[in-house]
Amino acid sequence: MIECRGVSFSYDGAVPALDGVDLNIEDGEFFCILGGNGSGKSTFAKHLNALLQPDAGTVRINGMDTRDETKTWDVRAACGMVFQNPDDQLVATLVEDDVAFGPENLGVPSAQIAQLVREALKGVGLVGFERHETHALSGGQKQRVALAGVLAMEPRVLILDEASSMLDPRGRKGLMKACRALHARGMTIVMITHFMEEAAEADRVAVFQT
């Protein structure tokens, strides 16, 4: 469960990007945060896996306070994040190597990594792409590889920070299909978007305003 109480944050003491946000997200929920540019929705997303810390208030992930530095990696393991530009997350030449990168750095045994890669690619509809070069993929395929790389680390919560905003309609459709399948399997989804049709897929929607 994600619990946010009175979360406020500003960049360099400027106008607050977040001002007293109170929000709960339940386990297994598909939750969407909708808003325009500058509304603070991406800033809020970065608080959910401790990339940013609140100036005031608290963010708790399964009871863990994100301000507790001893829990930072546990928080990030629980909350996997997919960003706007997949090229910023892809690190390897081949798809299977990219998806394996996270588990390898966590020290997961090789045999288990192979299974995690298979399951992650299956979850995003990219079985058969293992030996494809990442640079040759479409934007939508790249984003699904980035998603698979996060899934291979087995997070409990998936955060998508404007993950579809750089994709064409076909790519967005493929990403949403993967998200629906993951949600059907019980994963908590937090989607940050400005697309109304994506928000319509969610169980609940919070609207952030500038």
Please annotate each region the language model reported:
Residues 34-36:
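The feature captures the beta-strand-to-loop junction immediately N-terminal to the Walker
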Residues 49:
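Helix-to-loop junction immediately C-terminal to a conserved catalytic motif
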Residues 57-67, 75:
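Conserved ABC transporter NBD signature motif
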Residues 111-129:
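Conserved ABC ATPase "signature" region
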Residues 133-137, 141:
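Conserved ABC ATPase signature
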Residues 158-161:
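Catalytic Walker B motif of ABC-type/P-loop ATPase nucleotide-binding domains
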